[in-house]
């Protein structure tokens, strides 16, 4: 099997441009919008209303996160669909974007990536309408996705209020595990649990979030848990108190980060939030909380009275959840 991870400098969402750099790139632009534009740049996806239908649009493309091309295609697809779910939408159709070195890699590898993507799209009942390919030395695959909000409402990062609970639906640490895989320290069978979680769609988490009348939501991916939590805080003009011992993560990721094995994106993410961070935690814990996750879970806020129904609802929907903290008045990230 070709080691896809050896063909790229960074893997998965760890290859994203850091949040600080992205902020600098977009600074000062006057981006055109019209009266139908409900959400533009700055959230997980764009939202646009047309003929009474609320549409959600996003694009996500990643480098390999595993060496198996089928799994990479499926994980990349789940990752791309996630932003639609985070906005409260349901994906409808998609366009594929693929960068592939067809001079050096067997075409069957490319076909396996597509097969993985098609199977995941079928699971999500999302139609592939076409796509675009580029001959490129570093392989990349992803999707541009369009979805709708059938309930007639959408969720953004800006609705959280003081005194609410922070809910997370998948463990963190995948970026660190992928780094271990890329460095040859781990094998794919060592991270089977993480692979299964990356493959899992966020459709059930979306249904849980809506059932609990979530006030704000994002998906935890390349900017890390702290980076995405800060986006909710910044956009909602509140703060958050996160309890490290309540945050789910893979034990192997702790082992690796203590050995200084983690993607550089974790440090970029931590630097992005350091001016808003209040914490006396060990540095390895903060790095883990800043890990650039691929195909992570949803992070959302709910009123405390919703606790009465969260267990029953999550059980009915067959989705995991963890209460990792609460929102506070001070516009900071307090990590205990």
From Swiss-Prot:
Residues annotated to bind ATP: 16, 41-43, 60, 83, 131-133
Entry EC no(s): 2.7.9.3
Sites where the protein binds Mg(2+): 44, 83, 219
Active site: 13
GO cellular component: cytoplasm
Gene Ontology terms describing biological process: selenocysteine biosynthetic process
Comment on bound cofactor: Binds 1 Mg(2+) ion per monomer.
Listed cofactors: Mg(2+)
Keyword field contains Metal-binding: yes
CDD domains, A to Z: SelD
Keywords: ATP-binding, Kinase, Magnesium, Metal-binding, Nucleotide-binding, Selenium, Selenocysteine, Transferase
Top-tier EC class: transferase
GO molecular function: ATP binding; magnesium ion binding; selenide, water dikinase activity
Transferase in keyword set: yes
Site entry: Important for catalytic activity: 16
Function noted in UniProt: Synthesizes selenophosphate from selenide and ATP.
Family note: Belongs to the selenophosphate synthase 1 family. Class I subfamily.
Protein name, entry field: Selenide, water dikinase
Organism, as annotated: Aquifex aeolicus (strain VF5)
Lineage: Bacteria, Pseudomonadati, Aquificota, Aquificia, Aquificales
